[in-house]
């Protein structure tokens, strides 16, 4: 009888410890603030390139709650291509070429976390990305009209859709994710002959720097 009671007590204690361990594992992803570093590649198009690709690096923040969260990201893709724009002066209308170097992106998106496991955390989300060309080199003499045209096509907003998975290890997590964003025809990195999506594939690390809520309240 004593052996039976001891086994029962040990089983109960094991269940409690297992539940506490599982809850702790969940809390390390839920209600957390992650800082991350990433690298990968992105696709792009331009007036002279219908299907280009470039490496990228970046940093990001992921703020999680129970079922969703907020994602912020800054990155740069090392793009080198040629774009163009229509220049209108008093005498004629013609196309001028520009050299394009580097793409900077700021992304903000809402995330949801379906089907969570203890150490594996898939996620999907959507939001907006601000795209900006880092360097634009005009061929020929600049004019006030051409400067305005370049400024108008140098930056563009676009919706973005993100999906990925994060795996938790000690002392940090690793992740892989992909994104898709429709190209805006008013932006230098677009090609009017293709209705193209810009795709990115990224992988990196995230470190949990603390709680995203005030647990003292």
Give short role names for the model-derived ranges.
Residues 19-70, 206-217:
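Short glycine/proline- and aromatic-enriched beta-strand/turn motifs that initiate or cap beta-hairpins
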């Amino acid at each position: 009888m004593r052996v039976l009671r001891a086994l029962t007590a040990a089983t109960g204690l094991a269940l409690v410890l297992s539940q506490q361990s599982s809850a702790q594992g969940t809390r390390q992803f839920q209600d957390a603030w992650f800082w991350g570093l990433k690298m990968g590649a992105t696709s792009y198009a331009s007036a002279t390139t219908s299907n280009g690709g470039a490496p990228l690096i970046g940093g990001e923040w992921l703020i999680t709650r129970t079922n969703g969260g907020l994602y912020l990201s800054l990155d740069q893709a090392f793009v080198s291509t040629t774009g163009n724009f229509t220049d209108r002066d008093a005498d004629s209308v013609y196309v001028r070429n520009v050299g394009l170097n580097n793409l900077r992106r700021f992304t903000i998106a809402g995330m949801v976390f379906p089907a969570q496991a203890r150490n594996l955390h898939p996620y999907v989300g959507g939001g907006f990305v601000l795209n900006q060309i880092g360097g634009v080199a005009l061929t020929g003499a600049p004019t006030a009209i051409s400067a305005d045209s370049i400024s108008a096509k140098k930056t563009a907003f676009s919706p973005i859709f993100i999906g990925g998975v994060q795996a938790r290890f000690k002392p940090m997590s690793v992740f892989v994710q992909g994104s898709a964003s429709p190209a805006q025809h008013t932006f230098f990195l677009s090609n009017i002959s293709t209705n193209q999506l810009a795709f990115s594939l990224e992988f990196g690390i995230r470190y949990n720097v603390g709680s995203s809520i005030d647990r003292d309240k």
